[in-house]
Amino acid sequence: QFRDWCFEQGMNINTVKRVFASVRSIINLTMREHGIEGSNAFSGTFMPDRGDASTRQPIPTDNLRTIQQRCQTTDDEPRWLVALISDTAMRLSEAAGLAREDIVLDADIPHVIIRPHPWRRLKTKGSERTLPLVGCSLWAAERALEASHHSPYLFPRYCNENGCKANSASAALNKWLKQTIGDGYVMHSFRHSMRDRLRAVNCPSEM
């Protein structure tokens, strides 16, 4: 039932597998620490081949503009998160786990610093980087900063001292993307779109 619920929330097969792996590890540790005998109900759960593991296609430019316009019209925290990612191509967990101090607007070039935090790790060491804030991402950063003045986190809806709720954000935002521009696109698609946008202007590969 939990597996089916995950799919109903819009998660793809890879996301559901990661969720189950995390829960399975937690239960295994708890059973060992407390000497609980028996089997882990999350071990060996059947995962159907849904054919959605590779649906991360780039978002066409027209659809990208539609998304950004909807974000600015709706103007709420989930849409600021989408807008920030749309022109930076950050991973969702990277963006959702940002601290307010990671946003630097008073520099010659406004930018966001991607770095690890106690509540959110980065995927790899090479994931630490600085990204310019332009276009819709700059608007989103300004709006999120203005609204989160009471919190150390840029997106307090998705982040607190206990961790970053990237999985729940992913499910909700993927569902919103589907409602906005149709099937076949997920939050990770913004990374593929940025790759194509950079190639279109002959950006050096090392960038």
Ranges and model annotations:
Residues 1-29, 43, 174:
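Short, Lys/Arg-enriched alpha-helical recognition elements, typified by the DNA-recognition helix
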Residues 13, 17-22, 36-98, 126-127, ...:
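Basic, Lys/Arg- and aromatic-enriched nucleic-acid-binding interface segment
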Residues 29-32, 83, 87, 93-94, ...:
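C-terminal catalytic core of tyrosine-transesterase DNA break-rejoin enzymes
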Residues 31-41, 104-107, 145-148:
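Proline-centered turn/helix-capping motifs that create local helix->coil transitions or kinks
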Residues 44-47, 97-143:
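Conserved tyrosine-mediated DNA breakage-rejoining catalytic core shared by Y-recombinases
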Residues 53, 78, 108, 127, ...:
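Exposed loop/turn and edge beta-strand positions of beta-sandwich/beta-sheet ligand-binding modules
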Residues 102-109, 183-184, 201-207:
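Short, polar N-cap/turn motifs at the start of nucleic acid-interacting alpha helices
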Residues 117-118, 134-183:
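Active-site/catalytic core of tyrosine-dependent DNA strand-transfer enzymes
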